UniProtKB/Swiss-Prot annotation:
Keyword annotations of the record: Hydrolase, Magnesium, Metal-binding
Lineage of the species this protein comes from: Bacteria, Pseudomonadati, Pseudomonadota, Gammaproteobacteria, Enterobacterales
Protein name as catalogued: 5-amino-6-(5-phospho-D-ribitylamino)uracil phosphatase YigB
Top EC class, one word: hydrolase
MF terms (GO), sorted A to Z: 5-amino-6-(5-phosphoribitylamino)uracil phosphatase activity; magnesium ion binding; phosphatase activity
Protein backbone atom coordinates (compact mmCIF):
# COMPACT_ATOMS: atom_id res chain seq x y z
CA UNK A 1 0.00 0.00 0.00
CA UNK A 2 1.40 3.37 -1.07
CA UNK A 3 0.01 6.76 -0.11
CA UNK A 4 0.27 9.73 -2.46
CA UNK A 5 -2.23 12.14 -0.86
CA UNK A 6 -3.36 12.53 2.75
CA UNK A 7 -6.26 10.17 3.38
CA UNK A 8 -9.19 11.82 5.14
CA UNK A 9 -12.19 10.45 7.00
CA UNK A 10 -13.85 7.49 5.28
CA UNK A 11 -17.60 7.04 5.71
CA UNK A 12 -18.32 4.82 2.69
CA UNK A 13 -16.56 2.95 -0.10
CA UNK A 14 -17.50 2.69 -3.76
CA UNK A 15 -16.09 0.09 -6.12
CA UNK A 16 -15.60 -0.39 -9.80
CA UNK A 17 -16.48 -3.96 -10.81
CA UNK A 18 -14.64 -5.27 -13.88
CA UNK A 19 -10.93 -5.90 -13.34
CA UNK A 20 -11.19 -4.47 -9.83
CA UNK A 21 -13.06 -7.22 -8.01
CA UNK A 22 -12.31 -10.02 -10.52
CA UNK A 23 -10.45 -10.65 -13.77
CA UNK A 24 -12.85 -9.60 -16.51
CA UNK A 25 -10.70 -10.49 -19.52
CA UNK A 26 -11.64 -14.18 -19.84
CA UNK A 27 -15.27 -13.31 -19.11
CA UNK A 28 -15.47 -10.85 -21.98
CA UNK A 29 -13.62 -13.11 -24.42
CA UNK A 30 -15.99 -16.00 -23.73
CA UNK A 31 -19.06 -13.78 -23.70
CA UNK A 32 -18.23 -12.14 -27.03
CA UNK A 33 -17.62 -15.55 -28.58
CA UNK A 34 -20.91 -16.97 -27.34
CA UNK A 35 -22.79 -13.79 -28.25
CA UNK A 36 -21.52 -13.95 -31.82
CA UNK A 37 -22.47 -17.62 -32.13
CA UNK A 38 -25.98 -16.82 -30.90
CA UNK A 39 -26.50 -14.11 -33.51
CA UNK A 40 -25.09 -16.31 -36.30
CA UNK A 41 -27.46 -19.13 -35.35
CA UNK A 42 -30.48 -16.91 -34.84
CA UNK A 43 -31.36 -16.59 -38.53
CA UNK A 44 -29.89 -18.06 -41.76
CA UNK A 45 -29.32 -14.55 -43.12
CA UNK A 46 -26.94 -13.86 -40.20
CA UNK A 47 -24.83 -17.00 -40.61
CA UNK A 48 -21.82 -15.06 -41.94
CA UNK A 49 -22.10 -12.21 -39.42
CA UNK A 50 -18.74 -11.44 -37.77
CA UNK A 51 -17.45 -9.27 -34.93
CA UNK A 52 -16.07 -6.85 -37.51
CA UNK A 53 -19.63 -6.32 -38.73
CA UNK A 54 -20.77 -5.64 -35.18
CA UNK A 55 -18.01 -3.08 -34.65
CA UNK A 56 -18.96 -1.32 -37.87
CA UNK A 57 -22.59 -1.17 -36.76
CA UNK A 58 -21.61 0.05 -33.30
CA UNK A 59 -19.76 2.94 -34.89
CA UNK A 60 -22.72 3.76 -37.12
CA UNK A 61 -25.12 3.68 -34.18
CA UNK A 62 -22.88 5.97 -32.16
CA UNK A 63 -22.63 8.43 -35.04
CA UNK A 64 -26.43 8.51 -35.19
CA UNK A 65 -26.85 8.60 -31.39
CA UNK A 66 -23.68 10.21 -29.96
CA UNK A 67 -24.65 9.81 -26.30
CA UNK A 68 -25.48 6.12 -26.54
CA UNK A 69 -21.94 5.11 -25.57
CA UNK A 70 -22.82 5.94 -21.97
CA UNK A 71 -25.19 2.95 -21.96
CA UNK A 72 -23.28 -0.07 -23.25
CA UNK A 73 -26.30 -2.37 -22.95
CA UNK A 74 -28.51 -0.11 -25.05
CA UNK A 75 -25.66 0.43 -27.51
CA UNK A 76 -25.22 -3.32 -28.02
CA UNK A 77 -28.98 -3.83 -28.34
CA UNK A 78 -29.30 -1.15 -31.01
CA UNK A 79 -26.30 -2.52 -32.93
CA UNK A 80 -27.66 -6.08 -32.98
CA UNK A 81 -31.11 -4.81 -33.88
CA UNK A 82 -29.61 -2.97 -36.84
CA UNK A 83 -27.72 -6.10 -37.90
CA UNK A 84 -31.00 -7.99 -38.01
CA UNK A 85 -32.71 -5.21 -39.93
CA UNK A 86 -29.85 -5.22 -42.44
CA UNK A 87 -30.27 -8.99 -42.78
CA UNK A 88 -33.86 -8.50 -43.89
CA UNK A 89 -35.79 -9.10 -40.69
CA UNK A 90 -38.82 -6.93 -40.00
CA UNK A 91 -38.68 -4.25 -37.31
CA UNK A 92 -40.68 -6.47 -34.96
CA UNK A 93 -38.48 -9.50 -35.69
CA UNK A 94 -35.29 -7.48 -35.28
CA UNK A 95 -36.41 -6.09 -31.93
CA UNK A 96 -37.37 -9.55 -30.67
CA UNK A 97 -34.08 -10.97 -31.93
CA UNK A 98 -32.04 -8.25 -30.28
CA UNK A 99 -33.85 -8.83 -26.99
CA UNK A 100 -33.12 -12.55 -27.21
CA UNK A 101 -29.48 -11.83 -28.00
CA UNK A 102 -29.20 -9.56 -24.98
CA UNK A 103 -30.67 -12.21 -22.68
CA UNK A 104 -28.05 -14.63 -23.97
CA UNK A 105 -25.33 -12.01 -23.56
CA UNK A 106 -26.36 -11.31 -19.95
CA UNK A 107 -26.27 -15.03 -19.15
CA UNK A 108 -22.67 -15.40 -20.27
CA UNK A 109 -21.66 -11.98 -18.95
CA UNK A 110 -22.62 -13.05 -15.45
CA UNK A 111 -20.65 -16.31 -15.41
CA UNK A 112 -17.82 -14.87 -13.40
CA UNK A 113 -15.45 -16.71 -11.10
CA UNK A 114 -15.03 -14.29 -8.21
CA UNK A 115 -11.89 -14.90 -6.12
CA UNK A 116 -12.51 -15.94 -2.53
CA UNK A 117 -10.26 -13.05 -1.50
CA UNK A 118 -12.82 -10.65 -2.97
CA UNK A 119 -15.65 -12.21 -0.98
CA UNK A 120 -13.62 -12.18 2.23
CA UNK A 121 -12.51 -8.58 1.75
CA UNK A 122 -15.93 -7.18 0.88
CA UNK A 123 -17.49 -9.06 3.79
CA UNK A 124 -15.06 -7.46 6.23
CA UNK A 125 -15.36 -3.99 4.73
CA UNK A 126 -19.16 -4.14 4.70
CA UNK A 127 -19.14 -4.58 8.48
CA UNK A 128 -17.41 -1.20 8.79
CA UNK A 129 -18.80 0.90 5.92
CA UNK A 130 -21.64 0.94 3.41
CA UNK A 131 -20.37 -0.31 0.04
CA UNK A 132 -21.60 0.72 -3.40
CA UNK A 133 -20.73 -0.50 -6.90
CA UNK A 134 -20.27 2.03 -9.72
CA UNK A 135 -19.78 0.56 -13.17
CA UNK A 136 -19.60 1.63 -16.79
CA UNK A 137 -20.37 -1.94 -17.82
CA UNK A 138 -23.33 -4.27 -17.69
CA UNK A 139 -22.22 -6.84 -15.11
CA UNK A 140 -24.91 -7.64 -12.54
CA UNK A 141 -23.30 -8.43 -9.15
CA UNK A 142 -26.44 -10.12 -7.86
CA UNK A 143 -26.00 -12.80 -10.54
CA UNK A 144 -22.48 -13.81 -9.52
CA UNK A 145 -22.60 -13.67 -5.76
CA UNK A 146 -21.57 -10.09 -4.96
CA UNK A 147 -24.96 -8.40 -4.74
CA UNK A 148 -25.40 -8.78 -0.98
CA UNK A 149 -22.28 -6.76 -0.18
CA UNK A 150 -23.54 -3.57 -1.83
CA UNK A 151 -26.15 -1.09 -0.67
CA UNK A 152 -26.91 -0.44 -4.34
CA UNK A 153 -25.34 -0.60 -7.80
CA UNK A 154 -25.04 2.37 -10.16
CA UNK A 155 -24.70 1.71 -13.90
CA UNK A 156 -23.78 4.13 -16.64
CA UNK A 157 -26.81 4.82 -18.79
CA UNK A 158 -29.69 4.27 -16.36
CA UNK A 159 -27.91 6.26 -13.62
CA UNK A 160 -26.08 8.91 -15.62
CA UNK A 161 -23.15 9.36 -17.92
CA UNK A 162 -20.25 6.93 -17.77
CA UNK A 163 -17.19 7.49 -15.63
CA UNK A 164 -15.12 9.70 -15.55
CA UNK A 165 -18.15 12.02 -15.72
CA UNK A 166 -19.31 12.89 -12.21
CA UNK A 167 -22.96 11.83 -12.52
CA UNK A 168 -22.70 8.49 -10.74
CA UNK A 169 -20.18 9.71 -8.18
CA UNK A 170 -22.51 12.55 -7.19
CA UNK A 171 -25.52 10.20 -7.17
CA UNK A 172 -23.70 7.73 -4.90
CA UNK A 173 -23.00 10.45 -2.35
CA UNK A 174 -26.59 11.66 -2.56
CA UNK A 175 -28.09 8.20 -2.08
CA UNK A 176 -25.67 7.38 0.73
CA UNK A 177 -26.32 10.76 2.35
CA UNK A 178 -22.59 11.04 2.97
CA UNK A 179 -20.30 14.02 2.18
CA UNK A 180 -18.64 13.17 -1.11
CA UNK A 181 -15.21 13.90 0.33
CA UNK A 182 -15.69 11.09 2.85
CA UNK A 183 -16.14 8.43 0.17
CA UNK A 184 -13.20 6.34 -1.02
CA UNK A 185 -13.60 5.01 -4.57
CA UNK A 186 -11.64 1.90 -5.52
CA UNK A 187 -10.87 1.04 -9.13
CA UNK A 188 -8.29 -0.15 -11.61
CA UNK A 189 -8.55 2.62 -14.21
CA UNK A 190 -6.54 5.80 -13.68
CA UNK A 191 -8.84 7.85 -15.89
CA UNK A 192 -12.37 6.63 -15.27
CA UNK A 193 -11.92 5.59 -11.63
CA UNK A 194 -9.11 7.63 -10.10
CA UNK A 195 -9.46 10.75 -12.22
CA UNK A 196 -13.25 10.65 -12.22
CA UNK A 197 -13.49 10.16 -8.47
CA UNK A 198 -10.97 12.86 -7.57
CA UNK A 199 -12.49 15.42 -9.93
CA UNK A 200 -15.86 14.67 -8.34
CA UNK A 201 -14.48 15.35 -4.87
CA UNK A 202 -14.03 11.78 -3.66
CA UNK A 203 -10.90 10.13 -2.38
CA UNK A 204 -9.47 7.48 -4.69
CA UNK A 205 -7.68 4.16 -4.34
CA UNK A 206 -5.98 2.72 -7.40
CA UNK A 207 -5.81 -1.06 -7.48
CA UNK A 208 -2.80 -1.47 -9.69
CA UNK A 209 -3.24 -3.82 -12.67
CA UNK A 210 -0.52 -6.34 -13.39
CA UNK A 211 2.48 -4.48 -14.83
CA UNK A 212 0.82 -1.15 -14.04
CA UNK A 213 3.12 1.76 -13.19
CA UNK A 214 1.79 5.02 -11.84
CA UNK A 215 5.03 6.76 -12.76
CA UNK A 216 4.32 6.13 -16.44
CA UNK A 217 1.19 8.26 -16.44
CA UNK A 218 1.61 11.73 -17.89
CA UNK A 219 -1.32 13.33 -16.06
CA UNK A 220 -0.39 14.16 -12.46
CA UNK A 221 -4.03 15.03 -11.77
CA UNK A 222 -4.67 11.28 -11.79
CA UNK A 223 -2.57 10.80 -8.67
CA UNK A 224 -4.64 8.63 -6.29
CA UNK A 225 -4.74 8.96 -2.54
CA UNK A 226 -3.39 5.45 -2.26
CA UNK A 227 -2.31 2.54 -4.41
CA UNK A 228 -2.74 -1.16 -3.69
CA UNK A 229 -1.91 -4.32 -5.61
CA UNK A 230 -4.29 -6.62 -3.72
CA UNK A 231 -7.90 -5.91 -2.79
CA UNK A 232 -7.33 -7.46 0.64
CA UNK A 233 -4.99 -4.58 1.51
CA UNK A 234 -8.07 -2.43 2.07
CA UNK A 235 -8.82 -4.28 5.29
CA UNK A 236 -5.84 -2.54 6.89
CA UNK A 237 -7.91 0.66 6.78
CA UNK A 238 -10.48 -0.79 9.16
Amino acid sequence: MRFYRPLGRISALTFDLDDTLYDNRPVILRTEREALTFVQNYHPALRSFQNEDLQRLRQAVREAEPEIYHDVTRWRFRSIEQAMLDAGLSAEEASAGAHAAMINFAKWRSRIDVPQQTHDTLKQLAKKWPLVAITNGNAQPELFGLGDYFEFVLRAGPHGRSKPFSDMYFLAAEKLNVPIGEILHVGDDLTTDVGGAIRSGMQACWIRPENGDLMQTWDSRLLPHLEISRLASLTSLI
